[in-house]
Amino acid sequence: SPTKFVKKHHLANQTLSELLNAFLEEKGLARADVIRAAALNETFGYQIFMGQRNPSRNKVLQIAFAMRLNLRETNRILRAAGASDLYCKNRRDAIIIFCLDKGYRLQKTNEELYRFDEETIC
């Protein structure tokens, strides 16, 4: 049935907090470690994971890098946060996509953005 298909493939409209917590579980990550790796204020980070705060696009990207998400997963959490997907024809986004694909960490990604005179993520 369509309902089973949607559930099996996680296509239901999940909130950002639901998605983030599902990724934590799926990837065996600890929330505190992700918040630290994302260079987020601890309280603010916990509020994002609890669904009490709506983060900016850059904050969501910080979390994506901290969780080592791929492009598809990153775009899912961006959409859930009400932000635009990473778009390859946008120069800054293209650099971020490249860094995600290469498995770069947040700091290395910021260095690449800086090197190309683009706004860093944080």
What are these regions (language model features)?
Residues 39-55, 80-82:
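Recognition helix of helix-turn-helix/homeodomain-like DNA-binding domains
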Residues 65-67, 92-120:
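Long, compositionally biased
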Residues 1-30, 109-122:
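A short, Lys/Arg-rich alpha-helix, primarily the initiator
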Residues 24, 35, 64:
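The alpha-helix within a helix-turn-helix
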Residues 32, 43, 72:
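Key DNA-contact positions within bacterial/archaeal DNA-binding proteins
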Residues 52-65:
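Short, basic-rich loop-to-helix N-cap that marks the start of a DNA-contacting helix
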Residues 75-103:
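Short, charged recognition helix plus adjacent turn
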Residues 30-37:
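Short alpha-helical "recognition helix" segments of helix-turn-helix
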